[in-house]
Design a protein with these regions (language model features):
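Cytoplasmic helix-loop-helix junction between adjacent transmembrane helices
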Residues: 112-150
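Intracellular juxtamembrane helix-capping segments at the cytosolic ends
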Residues: 123-135, 319-332
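C-terminal transmembrane helical hairpin of 12-TM major facilitator-type secondary transporters
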Residues: 280-324
């Protein structure tokens, strides 16, 4: 990613908060397009006359875009200014969702989802760095949590609304709405996010070298295992809740909102814990998450326990993020 940014002491707390809100708006849009697709699988499957597992390729394509995009953009954009990069990333995201909305075939939709996923990791990485630099020492994890709060709020408001919109007006309308959010984010970043002063240039080799550091690798491993478990549950959550727990399909927007509330709670809690004791806090959260993921297999067979379990999955999964992001920034050094 681009060079480190110094703090901006001339900005008022209100200006800083407004900039972080603009960054969170992008996280909101990303959260909607990432998670709403899982609630729209049946509609997508019906539209193209395919099975739900086949429709699941639109989720896999997005995930592949995330995996491919993060390292490639790290190398290609190492000398870019952060505000410029953030706008370009959201431009790609917007384009991917607009193409998805008008996709005439499954293949086009899969390609569009791949494109929309490419900016995902880089956006959150750069946005977190900008937010942390604006917040200053002692408040960095909470600033990161505020950016990521957009992702959590998406699951409370955006995903249920997108699911409802997709059911009422077709899944295409949900992706088009996300495209509008992406375009609004580009404008918001241009207007309220400060252009950092030029600092020390970080070369791509230094950024890639950070991946070889044991602490960085350990942090990435914790994230891979934790989020892998979370998404293993969430990817087919509609099938689990409807066919296993016995919840009526019409209640899915409300169920997804419960998951989103868990993410909001976890995001706030995770930021507070990370600022107090980063490593011990992450260990505690990861341990609790492991237990909850294991118990969900049993909880999923009853409507009440399935919903409670989903809330806790969202809480613990989201609580990991601020601490992991802050830890990566701490140990990556110049490679951040």
């Amino acid at each position: 990613m681009p060079q480190p940014v110094a703090e901006h002491p001339g900005f008022s707390p209100a200006r800083v908060q407004l900039a972080i809100l603009a960054l969170a708006l992008g996280g909101f849009g990303i959260g909607v397009t990432e998670f709403a697709a899982m609630g729209l699988l049946r509609s997508i499957a019906d539209s193209f006359d395919i099975s739900e597992p086949q429709a699941g390729t639109v989720i896999s394509a997005y995930a592949l875009g995330v995996v491919v995009g993060a390292p490639l953009l790290t190398v290609w954009t190492s000398r870019w200014r952060r505000r410029t990069l953030l706008m370009v990333l959201m431009g790609l995201f917007t384009a991917g969702n607009v193409v998805a909305a008008f996709a005439p075939t499954l293949e086009t939709l899969v390609a569009a989802r791949f494109l929309a996923g490419i900016p995902h990791g880089a956006y959150f990485g750069v946005a977190s760095l900008v937010a942390a630099s604006l917040a200053g020492a002692g408040k960095q994890a909470r600033a990161v949590a505020q950016v990521l709060l957009g992702l959590s709020v998406a699951n409370v408001i955006g995903v249920p609304m997108a699911t409802w919109l997709g059911e009422a007006a077709g899944w295409q309308s949900a992706f088009l709405a996300v495209g509008v959010i992406g375009a609004a984010t580009v404008i918001a970043i241009l207007v309220v996010v400060p252009e950092p002063t030029v600092g020390v240039v970080v070369r791509a080799r230094e950024e890639l070298a950070a991946l070889a550091r044991p602490q960085v690798l350990a942090t990435l491993a914790v994230g891979a295992v934790g989020f892998g478990g979370m998404f293993a549950i969430y990817t087919y959550i509609q099938w689990t809740m409807v066919d296993v727990a016995g919840i009526d399909r019409s209640w899915m927007p409300a169920v997804l909102a419960v998951y989103g509330l868990g993410m909001v709670a976890g995001n706030i809690l995770g930021g507070i814990i990370a600022d107090r004791d980063l490593d011990r806090g992450l260990l505690l959260i990861a341990t609790v998450m492991t237990v909850i993921l294991a118990l969900f297999a049993v909880a999923a067979h009853h409507p009440a326990t399935a919903v409670i379990g989903l809330f806790l999955v969202g809480t613990t999964g989201s609580a990991l993020v601020p601490g992991l992001q802050t830890r990566l920034m701490r140990y990556a050094g110049r490679g951040q």
